[in-house]
Amino acid sequence: MSAPMIGMVVLVVVLGLAVLALSYRLWKLRQGGTAGIMRDIPAVGGHGWRHGVIRYRGGEAAFYRLSSLRLWPDRRLSRRGVEIISRRAPRGDEFDIMTDEIVVVELCDSTQDRRVGYEIALDRGALTAFLSWLESRPSPRARRRSM
């Protein structure tokens, strides 16, 4: 085989892997979930928002960004570590990507001794689903009884 032929084979293999990864990601996004917009805080103005899908599974909410090619979730929120800090309406240039029906919730994830802040923008139905999932967590005072 000549060098150009080897280069073409490598290029075809790389493109094939990219298509497989993209297909897998799109398949994961189409499996369902709740539409949401999320960003890490602190953030400046209306910057940093990413559209995606939130999927709930047991004690974890996984956020898949629409524009990401990762095979795993972009953010994971543990139900035991998430605290709601505040709620607000969109403001300023956030209205470019949100409507007045959206509620922005500021969260703090204190899982594993790390303090990470997020903001999630959800419509009223998605907010109800998120709050129901969050409020159904076991009480921190609840202990498993050993026999």
From Swiss-Prot:
Gene Ontology CC: membrane
By its UniProt entry, which Pfam families does this protein fall under?
Answer: DUF2550
Q: Where is the signal peptide?
A: none
What residue ranges are annotated as transmembrane? 3-23
Q: Where in the cell is it found?
A: Membrane
Indicate yes or no for the key word Transmembrane. yes
- What's in the keyword line of the UniProt record? Membrane, Transmembrane, Transmembrane helix
Membrane association type? Single-pass membrane protein
Q: Which family does it belong to?
A: To M.leprae ML1147.
Q: What is this protein called?
A: Uncharacterized protein MT1352
| Source species | Mycobacterium tuberculosis (strain CDC 1551 / Oshkosh)
